[in-house]
UniProtKB/Swiss-Prot annotation:
Keywords: Capsid protein, Helical capsid protein, Virion. GO terms for cellular component: helical viral capsid. This is Capsid protein. PROSITE patterns: POTEX_CARLAVIRUS_COAT. Its main location: virion. It is found in: Virion. Residues 1-60, 94-127, 148-212 are annotated as: Disordered. Transmembrane segments: none annotated. InterPro entries: Pltvir_coat. It comes from the Viruses.
Length: 414
């Protein structure tokens, strides 16, 4: 109580947001929030200070407390239970602001997308040839990851080379028209030997045999003998190469010799592959007739037309299965519907190891019913041929009896 009768006001220290802990230990005082920090946390009054205050203390500080409480809602997102931590709403708002700032910075740094003209040029550089291996876009590296990948610098994509990967299959033959006819054989480990080559003739003055005929070979020695399958009913690589030289002389491009052979063999599957078969028509887009090519084949290296067609029998088999077109005369040869694809006379070349193997192998093997049907048809054809031939050496009526020959016996009836 002052001399003028007025009651002195209690001192109320101001708590700054920078020093929140300093005001907590001040006795007989009420904390106050500074307006400088709108986001600062306000600590509750000390309970010990409140309990130590006299009961007869004046209530002059009550308006101050109400002002402190009234300031609390002014703080954005104030929650006295968080004690200075951010609320979920404030955290979401901060994350959104950071994401928006990062998006703006990224859009300023990244270059713009290519124009439609550039995209049109990229699509214009696409390779439209469906038979060419490699990637479709011109800007990409020319590597094909299909069944037979090719690599840069490996030559033409339509010709086999050392960089192309082919599956190891039974009866794989090298390209017959290539200069090197040594098939690629995989070797395992470092146990690789020198391939077997005979060389020129040895001197004939050898007087002793030291057991060269009885020398036993191990697996490495056997692997060095790279044998090329040969069959008398299938044209050899030497004959195929000679035929190729003759066809090139006729004006057929070298890179289309295989296509010409497959097309001719497919035609012979319809009309027959004997020397008496009449070949009809011309090759697509050309004035070269099939009869010309067939005659050239018969006149080269003693190769028959059936041997030449049997060399491409596996390709003809795949072609008929892909196009679902069996030989045209399968009904006339009395084949059933289930065995119609075996109704051609060089069917034996489909499973021969001497015939040219397709790059991806056979679509399927012939069934046992197809094998039996083809063998039976072949026996019937031989029976009919023998029926038209006679065995008499003279033409006297007493000998022939007006008959061409004795009645043949069909062997399949025995």
């Amino acid at each position: 109580m002052t001399s003028n009768g007025s009651q002195p006001q209690a001192s109320t220290p101001m708590v700054s947001a920078e020093e929140p802990a300093a005001a907590a230990s001040v006795p007989n005082s009420t904390p106050m929030v500074s307006a400088e920090g709108p986001a600062a946390a306000v600590s509750a009054p000390n309970s010990s200070v409140v309990s130590s205050a006299p009961a007869s203390a004046p209530t002059a500080s009550e308006p101050v407390i109400s002002q402190v409480q009234s300031l609390a809602p002014i703080v954005s997102g104030f929650d006295p239970n968080l004690h200075g931590r951010l609320t979920n709403e404030q955290m979401r708002q901060a994350q959104n602001e950071a994401a928006m700032q990062g998006y703006e910075e990224g859009s300023r740094r990244n270059p713009r997308l290519p124009s439609s003209t550039t995209a049109h040029n990229d699509y214009a550089s696409m390779n439209s040839n469906p038979f060419e291996t490699g990637t479709a876009y011109g800007g990409a590296p020319r590597v094909s990851f299909g069944s037979y990948p090719t690599f840069p610098g490996s030559g033409s994509a339509s010709e086999p080379n050392s960089q192309r990967i082919f599956p190891q299959q039974h009866g794989v033959n090298p390209p017959a028209h290539a200069s090197d006819l040594v098939p690629h054989q995989a070797t395992s480990g470092g146990n690789t030997g020198t391939p077997f080559t005979l060389g020129n003739r040895a001197p004939r003055n050898a007087t002793a045999n030291t057991g060269g005929m009885r020398r036993r070979l191990d697996s490495v020695g056997l692997k060095n003998i790279r044998y090329e399958p040969q069959a008398g009913v299938v044209a050899s690589n030497q004959k195929i190469r000679a035929v190729g030289v003759a066809l090139i002389g006729m004006g057929i491009p070298e890179h289309q010799l295989t296509e010409v052979g497959v097309y001719l063999a497919r035609h012979c599957a319809d009309v027959g592959a004997s020397d008496k078969s009449a070949l009809l028509g011309t090759f697509p887009g050309s004035d070269i007739t099939l009869e010309e090519v067939g005659t050239m084949i018969k006149q080269t290296e003693g190769c028959t037309l059936r041997q030449y067609c049997a060399f491409y029998a596996k390709h003809v088999w795949n072609l008929m299965l892909q196009t679902q077109s069996p030989p045209a005369n399968w009904v006339g040869k009395e084949f059933k519907f289930e065995t119609r694809y075996a109704a051609f006379d060089f069917f034996f070349g489909v499973e021969s190891t001497a015939s040219l193997e397709p790059a991806d192998g056979l679509i399927r093997l012939p069934t046992q019913a197809e094998r039996v049907a083809n063998a039976t048809s072949k026996e019937i054809q031989m029976y009919r041929i023998r029926s038209m031939e006679g065995t008499q050496a003279v033409n006297f009526g007493e000998v022939t009896g007006g008959k061409i020959g004795p009645k043949p016996v069909l062997s399949i009836r025995k």
